[in-house]
């Protein structure tokens, strides 16, 4: 899952 721009919580999964 990549970071979601415009979302309340943007997260990165490595």
Curated annotation (Swiss-Prot):
GO terms for cellular component: extracellular region. GO terms for biological process: neuropeptide signaling pathway. Keywords: Hormone, Neuropeptide, Secreted. One of its GO terms (molecular function) is neuropeptide hormone activity. It comes from Tenebrio molitor. It is found in: Secreted. It comes from the Eukaryota. Disulfide bonds: none annotated. The keyword Secreted applies. This is Antidiuretic factor A. To T.molitor cuticular protein LPCP29 C-terminal region. The keyword tRNA processing does not apply. Strong inhibitor of fluid secretion by the Malpighian tubules. Uses cGMP as a second messenger and inhibits fluid production by decreasing cAMP concentration. Reduces isosmotic fluid secretion by inhibiting electroneutral and non-conductive transport pathways. Reverses the stimulatory effect of diuretic hormone I.
């Amino acid at each position: 899952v990549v970071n979601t721009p415009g979302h309340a919580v943007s997260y990165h999964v490595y």
